[in-house]
Amino acid sequence: GLAYDIIKSLGINNEKLSEDILRPIEKQMPEVLTIMKLAKEEARRIGRNVVGTEMFLLGIIAEGTSVAFEVLNDLEITMKDARLVVENLVGYGNEYFDKEIIFTSRAKRVLEKAWLSAKNSNKSKIEAVDLLLAIIDEPNSLAMKALDQLGVDAVEIKHGIQGIR
């Protein structure tokens, strides 16, 4: 658009602009917002208009830089395996074309627990690790069912978080 034309006319290298300005802004973006965006993308990928805890799990893995990701990675949970398990749990749909993507009531509860966890730790924003702790606090969630099928339980995750922190 117009901004691109102005940048081009000023002779500013588009890659340099991205490197110097956009990436640092993205790094300041709270990781949980990135995870939410990735969770929505995962829901769309399998034709769903609902984001549940299982999509949060995929979002954490897809984000790939957080402490929560490191814990899951150390437990040898890969995106490929996690996607396969989640796809088997929820199946494919064609819903997302019709509606805006919404969060399940359990996903909202997990976000609320994550916010309380962050607040109780005197943090100004929710981190992925708060989200992961909130997920494992919901033993009947689809995310925990997926983790169970991947051979990981809440105790291992808590232990992993304590080991990294």
Sequence positions of predicted segments:
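Histone-fold recognition with a strong bias for associated Lys/Arg-rich disordered tails
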Residues: 1-165
